[in-house]
Amino acid sequence: MMTRTATDLARASLEAVKAGKRDEWLALFDDDSIVEDPVGPSALDPEGKGHKGAAAIARFYDTAIAGIKAFDYEIERTCLCGDEAAVLVTFRITAADGEPRVTNAINIYRRAPDGKLAALRSWHHGSEE
């Protein structure tokens, strides 16, 4: 099997979310991975330390992603350097409250030595469409 790059993992992550495939998305991460979405303190992560480990990442999915009614994205640009990919992406979602939103983000995906995602860090700003 060919080793996936961080860019491949980024696309796989986005496609799994778009398709609503929770288990497929969670399988992209290793046991010690961290998700910071967004980076810094937020309603889902008041201390801004991220969601670390399989159980915390699963809770993040269930709380932040599972309720999204519609999800689409457009990758504007990707920069790959070693085991990291910086992805400039525009998300178009319909949130759980039924409101459409457009969010521009810079996501950093870091590939672990085992070929899974070691980290997903997202900087974003949202606005209603």
Where is each model-derived feature located?
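Short, low-complexity N-terminal intrinsically disordered segments enriched in polar/charged residues
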Residues: 1-32, 129
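A solvent-exposed, acidic/Ser-Thr-rich amphipathic alpha-helical stretch
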Residues: 4, 23, 28-82
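Short, solvent-exposed coil/turn segments at beta-strand boundaries
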Residues: 32, 80-84, 109-117
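Short beta-strand segments that buttress and anchor functional surface loops
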Residues: 61, 88-95
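Short, cysteine-centered beta-strand-loop-beta hairpins and adjacent loop/turn segments enriched
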Residues: 67, 93-102
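Hydrophobic/aromatic beta-strand elements that line small-molecule binding cavities or substrate pockets
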Residues: 73-79, 90-92, 104-110
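Short beta-strand edge/turn micro-motifs at domain boundaries
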Residues: 102-129
